């Protein structure tokens, strides 16, 4: 999606316009889950949740999902969606052996308390938890072409040592590093 005239955060205009554009591109009438992908510091939470509610009420989405929220904001968003009688069912968050943010920002505990599901993205830490980085950064690594999510500066000798130590544990368990990371 492009930023458009309303940014790419959580405004009502942006969310509903992006949903319409996505449905048109996919040739669909609705999506099962319409996610809002990150907390917006510039848009009232009520506006964002109201837009998600409108997407459900208009039949363009069956359920609402949130992504990259912290625990306290998740609690507020859930209360708003409950008040609007909108089915909010799932959180999508980055979570891996290397990224345990949701344990520290209250999201994991709050989701459990509210009986909301969590689905992870990047459980292999952008490929770090595979055999690709055991010897360092491969020549064809995405850090050389698209460093938005995986940055060369973050793949330090210490990180490579951690990857190799985890790989040793995985091998001792009869697993690949990726298998162990996913099982974790």
Model region roles, listed by residue range:
Residues 10-26, 74-78:
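Short, acidic/polar
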Residues 43-184:
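Beta/alpha (TIM)-barrel catalytic core signal, keyed to glycine-rich beta->alpha loops juxtaposed to Asp/Glu
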Residues 23-43:
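Active-site groove signature of glycoside hydrolases
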Residues 1-16, 37-43:
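Active-site mouth loops of central-metabolism enzymes
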Residues 13, 29-32, 46, 178:
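Residues in well-ordered alpha-helical elements
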Residues 1, 29, 57:
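N-terminal binding-site loop/beta-alpha segment at the start of enzyme catalytic domains
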Residues 3-7, 33, 147-151:
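Short amphipathic alpha-helical segments at helix-loop
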């Amino acid at each position: 999606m492009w930023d458009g005239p309303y940014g790419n955060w959580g405004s009502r205009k942006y969310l509903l316009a992006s949903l319409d554009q996505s449905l048109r591109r996919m040739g669909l009438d609705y999506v099962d889950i319409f996610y809002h992908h990150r907390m917006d510091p510039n848009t009232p939470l009520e506006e964002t949740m109201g837009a998600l509610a409108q997407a459900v009420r208009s039949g363009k989405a069956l359920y609402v999902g949130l992504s990259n929220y912290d625990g306290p904001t998740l609690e507020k968003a859930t209360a708003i969606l409950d008040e609007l009688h909108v089915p909010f069912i799932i959180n999508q968050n980055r979570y891996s052996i290397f990224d345990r943010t949701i344990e520290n920002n209250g999201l994991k505990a709050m989701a459990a308390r509210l009986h909301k599901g969590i689905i992870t993205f990047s459980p292999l830490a952008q490929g770090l938890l595979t055999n690709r980085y055991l010897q360092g950064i491969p020549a064809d690594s995405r850090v050389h072409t698209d460093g938005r999510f995986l940055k060369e500066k973050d793949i330090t000798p210490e990180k490579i040592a951690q990857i190799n130590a985890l790989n040793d544990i995985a091998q001792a368990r009869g697993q690949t590093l990726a298998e162990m990371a996913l099982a974790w």
